[in-house]
Design a protein with these regions (language model features):
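Sec-dependent N-terminal signal peptides
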Residues: 4-13
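Sec/Tat signal peptide C-region and signal peptidase I cleavage site
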Residues: 15-19
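Sequence-level preference for short, compositionally simple segments enriched
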Residues: 20-354
Length: 354
């Protein structure tokens, strides 16, 4: 009966003249949430499906040990009531830790949009040392947008798991310890907050933010006007995973610049030493430019082989290429985000009671 009422709710929201197709999740009901994902996958199976909105009220949606919950449809907008109040959480057993096994959500669709929610992976990271890979969003999709999405975990928090992917983040927050923004494709992070956590239970060890493995795209990870919050240990911007990793930090605000290690990027690569690692216009909390004039690093593999020497400070000429229209030549995520945010705001006002 509950399933029948759930489906009837979808039809009523469509029939009563709303411009958008909407599924409204029952407040705090994780079964209703899972039903919504399944129904959205059925309704929006076609890659050109009309936009479908899933509205999730503030609440704690506990998946328990369930992992890899799929968002398999296309052109789905998953809209919470607020970033801090709408929390989707899982807690995998530490025995299954792994980058492809633990995700809270696994996005598999094209054109999906996430807004105003938190994904939390509660795997017992410190009990899993030296490993503890616990993903919040494993994104195997294409052209995903995350707007005001918070991800709480430690290692491998966000995983762009599609070699040709294009994704866009804005005003989001990602927490972690090591390689906690990792994977392939071209991903633009606009005005996001990057927060490091303790690397180990006793606080020892350095943090590493990004681990790109750029292979079939050109640009890799672009962090633009982001803020790094680090109150715990020293850290690097990132390190090489494999193939031709690319990562740039543009106009970054460092709240604790003294904790950024001198090389700025980890000189030890995992499977490759070559890379395109750059920064430009780095600032302290008062907005003062603290970018070194030069920073030449000798990158090697972990065994000190295959040295690759590179300057990591970007020139103005290089900077001029970093525009969203150059990265995403046939997609305008900025325009799409504005449109979806406006539509979502109207739906939130209509369906969420303050």
């Amino acid at each position: 009966m509950k399933r029948l009422l759930f489906l009837l709710g979808i039809l009523l929201l469509t029939i009563e003249g709303f411009a958008q197709r909407v599924i409204l999740v029952e407040k705090g009901d994780v079964v209703s949430l899972l039903d919504a994902f399944r129904e959205a996958a059925r309704l929006n199976n076609d890659r050109d499906s009309e936009r479908l909105f899933i509205l999730i009220p503030n609440g704690y949606y506990d998946l328990g040990e369930l992992t890899l919950t799929r968002v398999a449809g296309n052109n789905i907008a998953i809209i919470g009531e607020s970033m801090e109040g709408t929390i989707i959480r899982n807690a995998p057993d530490k025995s299954i830790e792994g980058i492809s096994r633990t995700a809270v959500l696994q996005n598999r669709g094209k054109g999906n949009y996430y807004q105003d929610l938190t994904l939390k992976n509660d795997l017992d990271y410190y009990a899993s040392e030296p490993d503890g890979r616990a993903v919040c969003l494993q994104d195997k999709g294409f052209r995903t947008i995350c707007n005001r999405v918070r991800m709480l975990s430690y290692q491998d928090t966000y995983y762009s798991d599609n070699e040709k992917c294009q994704h866009y983040f804005k005003d989001s927050e990602i927490h972690g310890t090591i390689d906690f923004i990792c994977g392939a494709g071209d991903v633009w992070f606009e005005r996001c907050k990057i927060v490091t956590e303790k690397r180990s239970r006793d606080g020892s060890g350095n943090n590493i933010i990004a681990a790109p493995r750029t292979s079939k795209t050109k640009w890799g990870y672009i962090f633009n006007r982001c803020t790094i919050v680090n109150d715990v240990s020293d850290y690097y911007y990132g390190r090489s995973w494999h193939t031709n990793p690319a990562c740039v930090w543009l106009y970054t605000t460092l709240l604790t610049p003294e904790k950024l290690l001198p090389a700025r990027y980890d000189p030890k690569g995992m499977k490759t030493s070559s890379n395109y690692f750059k920064e430009y216009g780095t600032m302290d909390a008062k907005g003062r430019n603290i970018t070194p004039k030069t920073n030449v690093v000798t990158f090697t593999l972990r065994d000190d082989t295959k040295p690759f020497v590179a300057e990591t400070i970007m020139t103005r000429e290089e900077l001029s290429k970093y525009k969203t229209k150059n990265i995403f030549t046939s997609w305008n995520p900025v325009k799409q985000l504005k449109k979806l945010e406006k539509q979502s705001r109207k739906l939130q006002k209509k369906h969420f009671k303050n």
